[in-house]
Structure formats: C-alpha cells, structure tokens
C-alpha cells in the first residue's frame, strides 16, 4: 500500500498540473474524520476554486475525470466521489489496503524507516548545570531530545547527541561553597550557612565522599578528592565531577545516552570566546558604551542591542553560546537542534544575531530550537514540590522510581513541547485504558498473547503468516486498522520535519484504539484456518508497528502484562 500511496500522490500531482498548470497546489491526501467518507480525502478543488474563479464542485468533477485517466488510479482505487462543497472522497480497493500487512511483515523493524543518507544533525539537550540532580524539566528535555534524535535516524540522518556542561558560571562557585560549608559541619539553617547555598541532601553526600578521598568518574575523566576542607578549588572540581557522574546515572536509568559532552569551560581555555568576540569587533558589529562592549543585535532583528562584555570585564551569558554554536558549525553540523526550557526564549534572537554578525557563513535561523514548558507533578491529588534528595524540586529519578522509565518517557512526550504538562503519578500507575502508556503497551501484549494461544491450541507457526491469504481481510475494523498501519511512515516523516515527537505518541494511541476495537469485534482463533491466519497476520503487523513506534519514544513493548 505504500507503493500505492506514492503512485497515487504522483497521479494527483499530474492531474492538478493539468487543471492549473500555472499554479498547481501541493498534492496531498487527508484522512477523513469518518470511515463512511472513504479512505482518503482530497481538498484541492476548494483550494483552486478562488484563483481559477470556478465552482469548486465543478472543479472536483474535472479533477476526478483527470484522475480516472491515470493508470495508478485505475490500479489502486475503487471509487472517487464528490461530497459537500467540493471534497473528493477516495475509496481504495480491498487489495490495495491488504498490501500493507505484507509490507510491514517483510520490512519488520525497518518499516517506516528511510534509507541512510549523508545528512548530519547535532541535537543538544538536557545540558544541565552540574550543580544538582536532574529535575523533571530535564527529564522532559531528555525524552524530547532523544525522541527527536530517533525520529531523524528513521529518516536516514546521522545524528550526534550532545550534552553541554555549564561548568564556568557563578553557580559552580555556589556549589563549591555549599559543599565546603557541609565539610565545616554546617547545615541549612545554621548560622554561617551561605545564603544562596544548595540545601539538598546530595551536598552532604558530596562532602562525605570528599572527606573519604574517593575517586569519581564522569564521562571519560576521573577526579580524586584531596579530603582537605580548605581546598576550595579541589572541592569545586570534585563536586562537579560527582554531580556529572550522578546525572549520568540518572540518564542511564532513563535510557538516554550521549555521544559527546562539551564543557563550557573549554571555550575559555581554548580561547574560543575571545576569538569569537574578536571576529565580531573586526567585523564592525560592536560598539562601546558606558565602559561595556555591545553587539549590534538590532541589525539582525533583535528588539535592542545587547551587552557582550560588562564594564568589569566579564562576559554576558550569551557570548559563550555564540562561540559554542560557531564551534558546532565549524565541526560540520549544518543542522543543529537545541532542546531547551521556554525560559531561554529571550536568548534566541541574540544568539542568532551573534552568529550572523560573526560572518562565518552561518545562515539565518540557525540553530533550530524546541522550547518546552514546565512540568507539574501531582501525587495523591496534590502538587509535589520538594524532593528530599534535591531539597527544592522533584527529580527525574523520583519519577522513575515512582512510575518506571516507560511511563515517564511516554508521558513527557505525550503533549506538545510548548504546552505546560501535569504529570499525574497516580494515573501513570493505573492499569487501565485511562493510562496512555498502559493502553498502548497492552495492545502489544494482547497481540502476543493471541499468537501464543494460536501456537499452543492450533499448532500455528508465526513464520507462515507472511504467506497468509490477505484477501480474507474485508471487515470494516480490518480496513480501519490497515489504513492506520499505512499512515505510519508519513506520520514519522512529518513528525521529524516538524520536530514533533508527540505526533508519534498520538499515533500510537490511535493505532492501539483501532486494534482494541478490532479485538472486540472479531474472533481470531476460528474454525477457518485461512481466515485465522489472515487475521493473525494483521495482528502481527500491528504489533510490529507498535514496537517500531514505541522504540522511537524509547519505550518498551512487553510481550506480557
């Protein structure tokens, strides 16, 4: 059916070019909201009516006439009908829809994937300060970022996952001071406890390991504590390494890996920040005022010019960001996606302005951004605000411990990134169709159970399903399920292009719903072996697509529940 869809799309494009050679609209099919309206819908006649100054129903008939002359339409389509003001409803032949089952079974885990290309993308996400455990906002970033990486990989891209460590800011000094205070026997609330210190129990854990002169490994680096409470620089280095290690453990528990870790401090150590500022000054894109160095960001659409270097000689926080993205470009990544919290919205214009002003060939609009809003955690009907481990927020590890990795990943991807999300812990633990991840995973487990029953009760061999007589699949619920399977590749490519992994979650819920309706309507272990085999082939194809889609989200597909 994938081949049929491709050929029909070409036929539609040719027919539109015939009707409107000077301004043909983009050829596209839509999915009717009701099955009674056909399998695919075409709205092109209504789009063309105004520019061509013709009645949309007359145009629809002309388009149908043009389509019916195409060989692909004759091969794959049963009927074309005009509806309403100018819709065209397209009904596929049963044999067309049945092909999707064989296509899925033949492709397996590759169904929906495109051939490998030379395209390269770098996706930066999480990028937490190494000052504490990962919170639920970092969890949303991790789920979104990893799913976007997997989406691009399904489209044949080579993807690099990068974590940027902000290890050169004021907060690192606060971390060191907090740990030193613990080493001095102080605790939150005591006289002498730093006003801006981190209060979580993890600070006491860092202090204890520092006194014990332990060695921690973070990424590819090791650091051994000196055990000296007066060694503030040693405390700083150990605390950063300790928390980087802890964050790595959190990400491992979440099933997220990174290919590369980039340190903000390296931008200063290698002179990249100074070099970037030098390029901007040499290009005449800066000016001095009030003892500070300013960047002319208004030349690139920003609402006002921005300070780059303050009068005390320190850089504002967007300057290393500009240097970092110049580095990404120089590494050959011309497709870069940043996953960040919505509080970073104000930095986008100035970073892009700095990249344009640097005049190194970076195009406008580089990099792409996906900004996500906050996550609120509810448990027992009340908002959870504080974690003992973190001291002031709910951690990602808390959620994983409470509900499991699969629930956390699916839930955090189940809404558009730019909407606030309420994570209901109680809902995530429910074992019914109210819980979206359970609903989808249960569909897969249910299919596996039916196939096991077939093997045990009727000595069925799953290897024979690829040879099933698919002509037996004519029930309305079967047609609905096959059409939903056929929509998977198009959905994947659209989700990748739009940076919208929530589309995958929406699709999987719809697919699970189509399966559950089918399960309720039909029997699968019948007295007719050919019918049973055909239906089980459809179930096996459905299970495969469920597995493929869940894998994109980093969620498992259990055989039993």
Curated annotation (Swiss-Prot):
Renumbered ranges of motif 'HIGH' region: 128-138
Record keywords, A-Z: Aminoacyl-tRNA synthetase, ATP-binding, Cytoplasm, Ligase, Nucleotide-binding, Protein biosynthesis
Short name of one Pfam family: Arg_tRNA_synt_N
Top-level taxon of the source organism: Bacteria
SUPFAM superfamilies per UniProt: Anticodon-binding domain of a subclass of class I aminoacyl-tRNA synthetases, Arginyl-tRNA synthetase (ArgRS), N-terminal 'additional' domain, Nucleotidylyl transferase
Catalytic reactions on record: tRNA(Arg) + L-arginine + ATP = L-arginyl-tRNA(Arg) + AMP + diphosphate
Annotated protein name in UniProt: Arginine--tRNA ligase
Organism lineage: Bacteria, Pseudomonadati, Pseudomonadota, Betaproteobacteria, Burkholderiales
């Amino acid at each position: 059916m994938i081949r049929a869809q491709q050929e029909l799309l070409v036929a539609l494009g040719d027919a539109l070019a015939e009707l409107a050679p000077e301004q043909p609209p983009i050829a596209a099919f839509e999915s009717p909201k009701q099955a009674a309206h056909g399998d695919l819908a075409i709205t092109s006649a209504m789009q063309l009516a105004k520019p061509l100054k013709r009645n949309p129903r007359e145009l629809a008939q002309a388009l149908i006439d043009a389509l019916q002359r195409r060989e692909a339409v004759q091969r794959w389509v049963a009927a074309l009908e005009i509806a309403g003001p100018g819709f065209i409803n397209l009904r596929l032949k049963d044999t067309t829809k049945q092909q999707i089952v064989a296509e899925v079974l033949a492709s397996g885990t590759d169904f929906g994937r495109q051939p490998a290309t030379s395209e390269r993308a770098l996706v930066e996400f999480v990028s937490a300060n190494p000052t504490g455990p990962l919170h639920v906002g970092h969890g949303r970033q991790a789920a979104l970022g990893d799913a976007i990486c997997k989406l691009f990989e399904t489209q044949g891209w080579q993807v690099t996952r990068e974590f940027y460590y902000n290890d050169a800011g004021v907060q690192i000094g606060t971390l060191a001071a907090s740990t030193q205070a613990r080493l001095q026997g102080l605790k939150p609330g005591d006289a002498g406890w730093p006003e801006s210190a981190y209060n979580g129990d993890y600070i006491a854990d860092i202090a204890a390991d520092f006194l014990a002169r332990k060695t921690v490994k973070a990424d590819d680096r090791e650091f051994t504590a000196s055990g000296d409470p007066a060694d503030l620089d040693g405390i700083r280095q150990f605390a950063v390494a300790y928390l980087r290690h802890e964050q790595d453990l959190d990400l491992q528990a979440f099933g997220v890996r990174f290919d590369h870790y980039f340190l903000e401090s390296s931008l200063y150590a290698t002179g990249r920040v100074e070099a970037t500022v030098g390029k901007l000054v040499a290009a005449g894109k800066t000016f001095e005022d009030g003892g500070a160095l300013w960047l002319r960001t208004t030349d690139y659409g920003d609402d006002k010019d921005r300070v780059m270097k303050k009068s005390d000689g320190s850089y504002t926080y967007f300057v290393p960001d500009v240097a970092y993205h110049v580095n990404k470009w120089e590494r050959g990544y011309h497709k870069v996606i940043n996953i960040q919290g919505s509080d970073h919205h104000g930095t986008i214009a100035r970073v892009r302005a700095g990249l344009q002003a640097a005049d190194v060939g970076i195009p406008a609009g580089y990099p792409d951004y996906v900004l996500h809003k906050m996550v609120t955690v509810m448990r027992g009907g009340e908002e959870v605000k504080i974690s003992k481990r973190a001291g002031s927020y709910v951690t990602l590890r808390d959620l994983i411990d409470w509900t499991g990795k699969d629930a956390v990943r699916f839930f955090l991807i189940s809404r558009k990134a730019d909407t606030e999300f309420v994570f209901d812990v109680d809902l995530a633990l429910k074992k019914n169709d109210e819980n979206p991840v359970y609903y989808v995973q249960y569909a897969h487990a249910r299919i596996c159970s039916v196939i096991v029953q077939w093997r045990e009760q009727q000595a069925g061999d799953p290897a024979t399903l690829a040879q099933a007589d698919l002509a037996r699949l004519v029930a309305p619920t079967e047609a609905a399920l096959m059409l939903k399977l056929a929509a998977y590749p198009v959905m994947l490519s659209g989700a990748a292009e739009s940076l919208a992994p929530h589309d995958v979650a929406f699709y999987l819920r719809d697919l699970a719903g189509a399966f559950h309706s089918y399960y309720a309507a039909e029997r699968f272990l019948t007295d007719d072996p050919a019918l049973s085999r055909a239906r089980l082939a459809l179930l096996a194809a459905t299970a495969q697509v469920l597995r493929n889609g869940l894998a994109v989200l980093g969620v498992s597909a259990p055989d039993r529940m």
